[in-house]
Every structure is written in C-alpha cells, then in structure tokens.
Amino acid sequence: MPRKGPVPKREVLPDPVYNSVKVAKLINKVMWDGKKSLAQKICYGAFDIIREKTGRDPLEVFEEALNNVMPVLEVRPRRVGGATYQVPMEVRPERRLSLGIRWIVEYARQRSGKSMMEKLAAEIIDAANNTGGSVKKKEDTHRMAEANKAFAHYRW
C-alpha cells in the first residue's frame, strides 16, 4: 500500500470513433506491448463485424454485453482466527466495469481459430445474448457468493 495517501485515478479519454470511455477501456485491455493502433483496428473491426451480423448499433450491443457480464457480487478472502473464509461482497462500480471488460477480452482470446477481430465480435455478441464464456464466469462468481452467504456477516 502507498505511504503517501491514495493513488489518484487516471482519467481515461474517450475513444475517437464512438466517443465512449468504455470502448477506450476495451481498446486498452485488448492492447499488447503498447501497440494501441493495432488494438484499435481489432476493436473497430470487431464492431464492424457486430454491425454486419446483428444489424444493430455495435455500441448498443457492447453496452448490453457489458451489462450481462458485469458481476454484482464476488467473494473475497478474509482471515478469521486461523481460518480463511470466502466472504461475499458487493462489487464497486469501477471494478464491475473493469472485470466485465477483462472477462470479455479474456474469453475472446481463449476462443479457437479465426482472427482476434472475429473472436472479440463473437464473444461480445454471445455476451449480449446471455451466452458465452464471460457470462458463465459471472454466473460462477455469483454462485460462489451465494454458496458462501453464511459468511456475509464477516464483511468489513
């Protein structure tokens, strides 16, 4: 932990095409080795594929996918008298967004074959339809929180 007080939050500027902070965060999450222009090509290409496949505004589909993936509850470890309990807690809004984007990109990367554009587009469409790996991850997280509800009184 920092000794000089809280670390200030970095301001993420909205992306140039959709003027959305969420899309900018998606681009930053897709980016590897600082290659932002390549990450932008991948994300905007994926959004074009989404427009072709669904016939809807890709930003709407992405927002819907994020809402289906963002977790409300998660478990956090808490040591009490030599035992570690998984304590269910609510997820802060900033963390919800970052987890949602992280899971979408992570499960898009795990898909087999094809280019990253197609994999990302497929994962976003699946998440918008409440299917896919990222939605399953959210459900697993919620299931863990539900299973450990007995330890909810250990919240801090």
Curated annotation (Swiss-Prot):
Positions of transmembrane segments: none
Family, as annotated: Belongs to the universal ribosomal protein uS7 family.
Name the record gives this protein: Small ribosomal subunit protein uS7
Subunit structure: Part of the 30S ribosomal subunit. Contacts proteins S9 and S11.
Listed InterPro entries: Ribosomal_uS7, Ribosomal_uS7_bac/org-type, Ribosomal_uS7_dom, Ribosomal_uS7_dom_sf
Function: One of the primary rRNA binding proteins, it binds directly to 16S rRNA where it nucleates assembly of the head domain of the 30S subunit. Is located at the subunit interface close to the decoding center, probably blocks exit of the E-site tRNA.
Superkingdom of origin: Bacteria
GO aspect biological process, one term: translation
Key words of the record: Ribonucleoprotein, Ribosomal protein, RNA-binding, rRNA-binding, tRNA-binding
Native source species: Caldanaerobacter subterraneus subsp. tengcongensis (strain DSM 15242 / JCM 11007 / NBRC 100824 / MB4)
GO cellular component terms, A-Z: small ribosomal subunit
